[in-house]
Amino acid sequence: MAPAMESPTLLCVALLFFAPDGVLAVPQKPKVSLNPPWNRIFKGENVTLTCNGNNFFEVSSTKWFHNGSLSEETNSSLNIVNAKFEDSGEYKCQHQQVNESEPVYLEVFSDWLLLQASAEVVMEGQPLFLRCHGWRNWDVYKVIYYKDGEALKYWYENHNISITNATVEDSGTYYCTGKVWQLDYESEPLNITVIKAPREKYWLQFFIPLLVVILFAVDTGLFISTQQQVTFLLKIKRTRKGFRLLNPHPKPNPKNN
């Protein structure tokens, strides 16, 4: 009976530790998100950093780190109000005993125009948004976006650039120009890098379900085999018992007489 108990355990372990999309279902690092989603902001603006977990543990408190120093904030959200230059730098968060998040870098500027991006490093296939932002949200007209020194897009009224599926060809140096109060201004350049998506996950999406199917097949096979063995042993036992009932007294051996 032992084999029948061991294999379901293996199957359960596989189902617990592997998610349907082929990713290990173990506690992952938390991730810091920004709202608004720009990591380059003007002095005096507000931004909220949120430490997003994966709900593996019930989060009771959060640790925030700014440039390596522990913050007094223990909530899952860190509010930066009336941003100062000192608020620039690296931010990380941590939930309980889970590893620290990957760092997020915030930059505080004082300028007339600021090119903002949803991310400076983008995974291939992910969306990318660019914004030519005016100081104190002042209107910007005759906006031109540039990539690697060449004009990319022009609008008389300011609009964002939306790239639905970023490719490695979208990597480059971006900046924007525009008019604020009838004066021409140019933003600081921003380097955008699009990296290729890792290929390992694709084969994992096929391997993990296959592993579960194999474990299930082994589990079923062992269960059937064990059932057959038990049935066979019970049949032998019943046969021997029936034979003893039909022959309660053994026949005498003539040689002993």
Swiss-Prot record:
Keyword set includes Membrane: yes
Disulphide bonds in the chain: C51-C93, C132-C176
GO molecular function, one term: IgE binding
Subunit structure: Tetramer of an alpha chain, a beta chain, and two disulfide linked gamma chains. Interacts with IGHE (via CH3 region).
SMART domains: IG, IGc2
One GO process term, biological-process aspect: mast cell degranulation
Domain Ig-like: 30-110, 111-193
Cell compartments where the protein resides: Cell membrane
Membrane-crossing segments per the record: 206-224
InterPro entries given in the database record: Ig-like_dom (IPR007110), Ig-like_dom_sf (IPR036179), Ig-like_fold (IPR013783), Ig_Fc_receptor (IPR050488), Ig_sub (IPR003599), Ig_sub2 (IPR003598)
PANTHER family recorded: HIGH AFFINITY IMMUNOGLOBULIN EPSILON RECEPTOR SUBUNIT ALPHA, IMMUNOGLOBULIN FC RECEPTOR
Primary location recorded for the protein, binned into one broad class: membrane
Tissue specificity as recorded in UniProt: Expressed in eosinophils.
Keyword Repeat: yes
Entry membrane topology: Single-pass type I membrane protein
Short name of one Pfam family: Ig_3
Signal peptide: 1-25
Organism for this UniProt entry: Homo sapiens (Human)
PROSITE patterns: IG_LIKE
Ranges in the topological domain labelled Extracellular: 26-205
Keyword terms of this UniProt record: Cell membrane, Disulfide bond, Glycoprotein, IgE-binding protein, Immunoglobulin domain, Membrane, Receptor, Repeat, Signal, Transmembrane, Transmembrane helix
Glycosylation: residue positions: N46, N67, N75, N99, N160, N165, N191
Function per UniProt: High-affinity receptor for immunoglobulin epsilon/IgE. Mediates IgE effector functions in myeloid cells. Upon IgE binding and antigen/allergen cross-linking initiates signaling pathways that lead to myeloid cell activation and differentiation. On mast cells, basophils and eosinophils stimulates the secretion of vasoactive amines, lipid mediators and cytokines that contribute to inflammatory response, tissue remodeling and cytotoxicity against microbes.
GO CC terms of this entry: cell surface; external side of plasma membrane; plasma membrane
Sequence ranges on the Cytoplasmic membrane side: 225-257
Protein name as it appears in the record: High affinity immunoglobulin epsilon receptor subunit alpha
